[in-house]
From Swiss-Prot:
Coiled coil: none annotated. Its EC number is 2.7.1.23. It is found in: Cytoplasm. It comes from Lactiplantibacillus plantarum (strain ATCC BAA-793 / NCIMB 8826 / WCFS1) (Lactobacillus plantarum). It holds the Pfam family NAD_kinase. This is NAD kinase. The lineage of its organism: Bacteria, Bacillati, Bacillota, Bacilli, Lactobacillales. Involved in the regulation of the intracellular balance of NAD and NADP, and is a key enzyme in the biosynthesis of NADP. Catalyzes specifically the phosphorylation on 2'-hydroxyl of the adenosine moiety of NAD to yield NADP. Signal peptide: none annotated. It is an enzyme of class 2 (transferase).
Amino acid sequence: MKVTIFANASAKTKKVAGELHTKLLAAGFEIDDEHPDIVLSVGGDGTLLAAFHHYSHMVDQVRFVGVHTGHLGFYTDWRDYEIDQLINGLLEDNGQSVTYPLLAVDITYADTDATDHYLALNESTLKKLGSTMVADVYIQDELFERFRGDGLCVSTPTGSTAYNKSVGGAVIHPRLDALQMAEIASINNRVFRTLGSPVIVAPYETITIRPQQQSHFVFTADQMDTQPRPIEQIRYSIANRRIAFAQHRHNRFWQRVGTSFIGLDEQ
């Protein structure tokens, strides 16, 4: 089996990654950074997001494993002191995996005919800096609402516990194929109205955002952001590709939610 280690730059993580590298070689694994079968992310959820985007061009061909060097993360099944158990799990691997949906993003710009395509694991946002964003929101190409506020966030189920949750979005089990749109500081009064709550759409439905100002907007996809540009529309859909995690020991989702946000293990 060919594996690679994708680690962040912290001193603790470098030490763990070095130990993992040594033990992988001793166990007979081949280290291949170009065409791995498994990507071992060492760090936190941010490191795994970076690893996903680094290998997104071959996401159909790799599986991911997260090793956390801090507190419990949503994408990490192993702790830094469990390297030996992880190695044993890899030695017994038979290709088992759990897969989650990804977000496909297509952007059309007002100043060019080109369309940019992005893939996100967590979420994508659209914001207008310095003033209120006005945008028409379409679901399945039918006008749903005219939004006024700071911006909009569209997330995957796995991303529902990230930025989406901080702006009032719902937490969705990652095995569901769905998209969620959450409003960021929407304006609601007697003159201007939005739904004022998160919207969850079916896996075959698209969400399209069409800004109503000839202005520059900031677009993000996970950790990546773009320079402000005049955007004509952004179309969101469930991607036809999925991310796969090696299922040697996949922790229960609701247990992670309770541990991370409620502190059930401390009560």
